[in-house]
UniProtKB/Swiss-Prot annotation:
Name by which UniProt lists this protein: F-box/kelch-repeat protein At3g06240
Organism, as annotated: Arabidopsis thaliana
SUPFAM superfamilies: F-box domain, Galactose oxidase, central domain
Keywords from the named record: Kelch repeat, Repeat
NCBIfam families: F_box_assoc_1 (TIGR01640)
Kelch repeat coordinates: 224-270, 316-362
């Protein structure tokens, strides 16, 4: 990668010299005088990081055309995903704590404990219209014009508010920066698309008053990005609908007989081609892992391990995640826990096993492994924690210039050129 970068810098310098010669002579260079044929330049560009390619857009028409071409973006992404060592170089951590920040994932595995962060100008970051919408949803239409409310709530406080990270896939991050607003956002290129509003179930008067959760993932069979939304229409019924980026529209799927709990307020986790939550099955009052298959758009159940239900706390609930390529669930309540339940064989109920960790927690979610699979990044009781399963050692990570808020969110993404605005357009 370093050699390619150096070669590219040499090409850039030669291109600049050629431009200066054109300016001095007052004529354009012939194709024979180009430094390298376009096809060679394309091959070199394909092996550069997405961020570097973006910086070269203004160099020439060829570079600008390639960097914004959907077909080029897909080939570039495929080269990244095909090789694990290359993919790890392009992986980033995105954190939501008042604002959105990206962290260099490799620096975590290199032993750096105070991480540098890049703040993002995500969609609607300073948009006053979203602030107005938030106030209306918060206080209700009948109080919206009350000046006393406006004195307590202001746009400055909103800009320091919450951004929900729904999920990520192939460089696109699904975020919800305000009431009713959902975006597909590429942190690498800055491209974004606001998704159309979903239709409201007939039995729901105001969606903001009802439980709702999202899940985001990629359908490789149809080359489509999908967002599934679940809304509670009663205590034991969830209304399911799905958004297709290709069609740019929502479709209602079905009703589900599940009760939500506190842990299910978190977004679903994308793993093994499906989105996962933990809900309570209404008829038997039994908690299950519910999986939404992104390709077939069907729901299926997997049992939660029986022993994991031993927690007697009345507000006990489960959070689903992934750990070293395996599905896992963790208990989250006001009692402390020290274990993680891992499914060794996906879909096999008998493959659940308990892993004890040398940490006590009330709320915890595994985020991802570092370059060394023995180390895992955890979102633990409001802290970002690096845990080593081999030595049972742990360390809290800090982010330079960022104070993590209680209940911050984090996810991983890969740097890519994929644009949410290019779908439905032939490359």
């Amino acid at each position: 990668m370093k050699a390619i970068q150096l070669l590219w810098e040499a090409i850039m310098e030669a291109t600049k010299r050629e431009r200066r010669r054109e300016d001095d002579d007052g004529e354009k260079a012939s194709p024979e005088s180009l430094v390298l044929p376009p096809e060679i330049i394309t091959e070199i560009l394909l092996r550069l990081p997405a961020k570097s390619i973006g910086r070269f857009r203004c160099v020439s028409k060829l570079f600008c055309t390639l960097s914004s071409d959907p077909g080029f973006a897909k080939i570039h992404l495929d080269l990244i995903l095909r090789n694990e060592s290359v993919r790890s170089l392009h992986r980033k951590l995105i954190v939501s704590s008042h604002n959105l920040y990206s962290l260099d994932f490799n620096s975590i595995g290199d032993g750096i404990r105070d991480l540098a962060a890049v703040e993002h100008n995500y969609p609607l970051k300073d948009d006053p219209s979203i602030f107005s919408e938030m106030i209306r949803n918060y206080v209700g239409d009948h109080l919206y014009d009350d000046r006393r409310v406006m004195l307590k709530l202001n746009a400055k406080s909103y800009r320091r508010n919450w951004v929900e990270i729904v999920g990520s896939s192939n460089g696109l991050v699904c975020i919800s920066p305000g009431e009713g607003a959902v975006f597909l956002y590429n942190p690498t290129t800055g491209d974004s698309k606001r998704l159309p509003e979903n239709f409201r179930p007939k039995s729901v008067e105001y969606e903001r008053d009802n439980f709702q959760t999202y899940g985001f993932g990629f359908d490789g069979l149809t080359d489509d990005y999908k967002l599934v939304k679940l809304v509670a229409t009663s205590e034991d019924i969830l209304d399911a609908s799905v958004y297709s980026l290709k069609a740019d529209s929502w479709r209602r799927i079905c009703n589900l007989n599940y009760e939500h709990n506190d842990g299910s307020y978190t977004s679903g986790v994308h793993f093994n081609g499906a989105i996962h939550w933990v809900f309570t099955e209404s008829r038997h009052n039994q908690r299950v892992v519910v999986a939404f298959d992104i390709q077939t758009e069907e729901f299926r159940e997997m049992p939660v391990p029986d022993e994991a239900e031993d927690c007697s706390h009345r507000f006990s609930n489960f959070v689903v995640g992934s750990l070293n390529g395996r599905l896992c669930v963790v208990n989250s309540c006001y009692d402390v826990h020290d274990d993680i339940w891992v499914m060794s064989e996906y879909g096999e109920a008998k493959s659940w096993s308990r892993i004890r960790i040398n940490l006590l927690y009330r709320s915890m979610k595994p985020l991802c492994s570092t370059k060394n699979d023995e180390e895992v990044l955890l979102e633990l009781d409001g802290d970002l924690v690096l845990y080593n399963f081999e030595t049972n050692a742990s360390s809290n990570l800090g982010i330079c210039g960022v104070k993590l808020s209680d209940g911050f969110e984090a996810n991983t993404y890969v740097e890519s050129l994929i644009s949410p605005n290019s779908y439905g357009i032939e490359s």
